[in-house]
């Protein structure tokens, strides 16, 4: 069994335990701390990648969202800077989505 399946099984077992026996303050606090830790890690990475995006935005005089639309549509070249910029932009957006998911906003 792979790690993700094992983790999902543990989460389901925990859900069943809480439904049957009620809330456990220790479990609730542990889960909150794990989520807070992961959210903080994502925030740090988002900030770091955001700084990298700003370097490209200043160098090429356009916002990353505008660049990515043009790049995806093939309207600008595919030099190494653009490939790197595109990758960083996509990583940045994926991390934002993950963070929002952990925060329960999506």
Regions found by a protein language model. Give the residues of each.
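Short, compact, well-ordered microdomains
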Residues: 78-104
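Short E/K-rich amphipathic alpha-helical oligomerization segments
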Residues: 54-76
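Generic serine detector
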Residues: 28-32, 64-65, 72, 86-87
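Small, basic N-terminal interaction modules of short regulatory proteins
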Residues: 1-58, 62, 97-106
């Amino acid at each position: 069994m792979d790690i993700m399946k094992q983790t999902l099984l543990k989460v389901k077992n925990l859900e069943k335990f809480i439904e049957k026996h009620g809330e456990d303050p220790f479990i609730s606090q542990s889960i909150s701390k794990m989520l807070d830790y992961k959210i903080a890690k994502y925030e740090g990475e988002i900030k770091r990648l955001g700084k990298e995006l700003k370097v490209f935005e200043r160098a090429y005089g356009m916002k990353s969202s505008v660049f990515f639309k043009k790049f995806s549509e093939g309207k600008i070249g595919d030099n190494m800077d653009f490939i790197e910029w595109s990758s960083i932009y996509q990583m940045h957006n994926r991390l934002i989505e993950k963070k929002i998911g952990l925060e329960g906003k999506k």
